[in-house]
Amino acid sequence: MSNKKILIVEDDADVRLGYKILLTAHHYDTFFAGDAIAAISEAIMHQPDLILLDLGLPAGDGFIVLERFRANMNLALIPVIVVSARDLKEDKERALKAGVKGFVKKPWNDAQLLALIKRFLGQRDPLVLDRMAGHWQ
């Protein structure tokens, strides 16, 4: 059985290292994008089973990245969990309305993050497909 693939969209090298240590210890394959532009190309290239997305990114914020994921037929169904230092109620509501599966505040709790990952890993969201069907026709 192959390992599940997780794309981490995060600009901070220390945080990326933290993800790598945590997730490889739990047998996940990790791929990284350090900005909004790389996020789309890495997602298309690797077709991850799940995406962890920071909101504060260079070259466009996480909401722009999320919109681009949802607008791409090959990426729209991949579950996304936001992991961000931005902890505003408005950000959480906007992210959940955009279809993210969860919102985790940095610094994250390993057990909480792993539980969310396990819960949503590989789970394609038919509601997103229904919402986007008109866009793709």
Task: Describe each region flagged by the PLM.
Residues 35, 61-67:
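Acidic catalytic/metal-coordinating carboxylates
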Residues 13-31:
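Two-component/phosphorelay signaling modules centered on CheY-like receiver
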Residues 10:
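Conserved acidic carboxylate
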Residues 64, 87-105, 115, 119, ...:
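Alpha4 helix (beta4-alpha4-beta5 surface) of REC/receiver domains from two-component response regulators
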